[in-house]
Amino acid sequence: MNNNKKWEEYDTLVLPDGTEIDMLKLLNEQDRAKAALAHIEPFFAGLIGKVRFVYTFHVETQATDGYNIFVNPYFTSKLTLEQKVFVLAHEIMHNILNHLRRGRALNHPQDKSNIAADYEVNSQLEQMGITNANIMNSTGALYDKKYDNMGYEQIYATNPAGPSSGDKQQNDQNKHSKGGQNQQGGGGGGNQQYSADYKAGWAQAIEDYKNGKLKI
């Protein structure tokens, strides 16, 4: 095997347990997911083109460092088209909301920061109509309606111990904890001032993207 060859350059991957992954099929399905997301919400179209997709087994599911989206071929090959669209939108939203940069600035513990950031992202996607709780639950994502209209800081402060034992945790806590490819974030909150701050932050992110100032 050519060790310099990228995973996506293989027609078929054979895992140690004998599992075969059709990479041509996977890449085609990923392209369909990108097109579907851009159709559902055109705002994402330009953002999809700005990130590089890296297929790797160093993450358990998918993750982003703000510039790349790291894709585990085995995990992703098992997803339906709807699930692929959700996971793709989820990773891009971490970039839009600058979770990695903001989490580092606040110096919060990584796992707890990831959990708060994931709750914020998934709540936003549900409210935008890109996904729903059933799709998120099927991928093990973290979602709780009580965090709707709340941002990273308040979610973190409200739930500092992380999700309860009843919450879904196959999650992004695992997927963002490998190799520093994590994202933590900022935003608003449940009271009036937090909500105003959150909406202002989201509006500013969109404006920055339109003006070419948003770097992902």
Question: What residue ranges belong to the model's regions?
Answer:
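Basic/hydrophobic alpha-helical interface regions
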Residues: 1-84, 88, 92-131
